[in-house]
């Protein structure tokens, strides 16, 4: 029997704390923080179980961290894992991340974010959306004695049995979809800067815009997708870009909910990269200062860059080949617009990260700063197999989707009338 190869476990989720200039990497059940200046690991948190080895893999999957969000002032960080545990952290000091509370939520979380007044907004796989504040954590048995401090990268023991015994407080949703929720965004209302809206998407091609926190008041819908919506991102406070199981990504005006453009992403990928499978959009990353948007698709080793015109149309800009499938991408510096890309090293046994910078001609160029090399070599977790499934978005596609049939039969892909070119 051949020996299993040891590799650095990839990061399924990335986010950047711009106030303190560090990145948070979710690597299976590990929550890792690294300084963007030095590459030093500033904190590490992981579930530590006492069960025997044959159940350890299942435990690691259950503790896989799927989402991380920071409050607007970066004083709080929220994380949620596969085992439906919502955690709230004090992130005031980057070298001393303190776990304040953790509490189970009724169903598995699909996405979460912070609202402007520091409430945590999260949606579950059944389509319900909830809004809680810090006081919600204290309504059960979670108390000061159940905290865990991460000091200088070392975690103090947590009494997990006691924490899991906390009674679940009855939660009432502020809104709901009749389908699996895929993403949510709380943003400034483009028609009234003093108000907020909540944008939600689901498996059944819907994008809904509602008032926040009075989400029962629906402002409108952005309709045009023909398959599930997996990713949304704000280009500015009135322009939304969305993608999913379609061959196109869409640009929406949030003031009148009209489609401004439908950009043929499949053609962009198929021209420059090998593509013989249905597309699933996994990353939409606006680079506002350069009037660009970067797109990645699940399982594909490349990025597509599109130019945003003044009329909010998308025009093909460039394609960039990478050394492995993209898992996530995040802007590391809004001054230089450097992009950090997480790669699925469980396939390539190679690099976990690649970086993109832009030259004077606005062309995307691959680079690997020493800081990122240090994070990759010294900071990531070594393993012989993935702790958890890393690519899951494609499971949202329905078996009767025409985007599957068009690939299987070799026919031309379904088209959407586009306003570009």
UniProtKB/Swiss-Prot annotation:
User: Biological process GO terms, please?
Assistant: tRNA (guanine-N7)-methylation; tRNA modification
Which residue ranges contain the repeat WD?
A: 60-99, 176-222, 224-264
The annotated pathway is: tRNA modification; N(7)-methylguanine-tRNA biosynthesis
Places the protein is found: Nucleus
Q: Name one GO cellular component term.
A: nucleus
Transmembrane portions of the chain: none
Q: What is its main location?
A: nucleus
Biological role: Required for the formation of N(7)-methylguanine at position 46 (m7G46) in tRNA. In the complex, it is required to stabilize and induce conformational changes of the catalytic subunit.
Q: Quaternary state and partners of this protein? A: Forms a heterodimer with the catalytic subunit trm8.
Tell me its family. Answer: Belongs to the WD repeat TRM82 family.
Q: Which HAMAP family match?
A: TRM82
Q: Know the name of this protein?
A: tRNA (guanine-N(7)-)-methyltransferase non-catalytic subunit trm82
Q: Please tell me the species this chain comes from.
A: Schizosaccharomyces pombe (strain 972 / ATCC 24843) (Fission yeast)
